[in-house]
């Protein structure tokens, strides 16, 4: 999210869903975002180095209970109102909503998108504080018909969306005091929503560790945002590891694939009140916990002592 959009979310949130939260704090956040916007020298549609990063702004817990989503179980067309390239193969897409309403999507829920003859699930990275629109961070794959379709259609064209309430596997507030999140590639997107809820909710004391695996630094779209959230919140720790980063490189963080040793070093231990959330490509599920659509727990997480009830496969 760009600074101006960050301010717009703060203002919209203070007007619609800011009950119980200091209006002064919200206003200050909006002013800060506008100051950053002014200092950046970037106007709407402008370009700068920050235009190629994903900037979700500070955590905002704009929660919505199940059943309030703007999309139901029938397909509804939403117009593409903005598209911004954030890496060589990823775009941030903004779709419009009628009557200036918010998306109203419950935490960690997803939307189904339809286009180019295929249907795929996507978890929005914007919060319910954004009025009149929602945003998707889409990885564009060479073989991905829908992702290529959304990355190339003209502004003003529409994509069909719907929401099936039963796709929410776990809901905020989460039934744990310590949470480990393991993400592969674009699997970080549902965790953006979860972290907004946890870190943005006053009084929430849940401790969270996020371990994200990407191929290269260019693929780690949210690393700067996660690092900023971790720096400002002692309850959150973010670890990023790259598997194919060229050498030499400016990257000074961890390298290599996820393995039992890394997970044991950073995840909360397999004790009561601990929950492990997993999201990523099929190979990640196979290694860590078994296929996504199979309830039984296998793989590295079982070997580390976690139970089936402690591991949620997104």
Regions found by a protein language model. Give the residues of each.
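Structural motif
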Residues: 178-180, 209, 275
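Ferredoxin-reductase
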Residues: 58-157, 214-215, 243-244
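Histidine-anchored nucleotide/phosphate-binding helix
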Residues: 188-202
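A short, basic/flexible loop-to-alpha-helix module at the beginning of a structural domain
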Residues: 164-175
């Amino acid at each position: 999210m760009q600074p101006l959009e960050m301010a717009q979310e703060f203002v919209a949130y203070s007007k619609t869903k800011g009950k119980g939260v200091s209006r002064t704090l919200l206003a200050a956040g909006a002013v800060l975002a506008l100051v950053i916007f002014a200092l950046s020298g970037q106007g709407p549609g402008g370009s700068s180095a920050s235009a190629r990063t994903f900037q979700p702004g500070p955590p905002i817990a704009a929660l919505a209970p199940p059943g309030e989503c703007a999309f139901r179980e029938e397909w509804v067309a939403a117009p593409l109102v903005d598209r911004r390239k954030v890496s060589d193969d990823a775009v941030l897409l903004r779709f419009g909503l009628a009557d200036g309403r918010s998306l109203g999507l419950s935490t960690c829920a997803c939307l189904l998108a339809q286009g180019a003859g295929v249907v795929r699930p996507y978890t929005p990275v914007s919060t319910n504080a954004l009025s009149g629109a929602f945003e998707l961070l889409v990885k564009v794959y060479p073989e991905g018909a829908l992702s290529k379709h959304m990355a190339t259609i003209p502004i003003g064209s529409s994509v069909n969306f719907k929401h099936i309430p039963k796709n929410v596997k776990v809901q905020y507030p989460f039934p744990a005091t310590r949470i480990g999140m393991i993400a592969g590639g674009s699997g970080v997107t549902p965790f953006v929503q979860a972290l907004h809820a946890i870190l943005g909710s006053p009084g929430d004391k849940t401790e969270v560790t996020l371990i994200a695996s990407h191929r290269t630094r260019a693929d780690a779209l949210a690393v700067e945002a996660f690092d900023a959230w971790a720096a400002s919140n002692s309850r959150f720790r973010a670890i990023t590891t790259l598997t194919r980063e060229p050498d030499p490189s400016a990257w000074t963080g961890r390298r290599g694939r996820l393995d039992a040793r890394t997970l044991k070093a950073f995840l909360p231990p397999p004790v009561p009140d601990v929950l492990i959330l997993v999201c990523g490509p099929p190979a990640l599920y196979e290694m860590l916990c078994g296929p996504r659509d199979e309830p039984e727990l296998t793989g590295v997480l079982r070997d580390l002592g976690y139970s089936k009830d402690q591991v949620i496969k997104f």
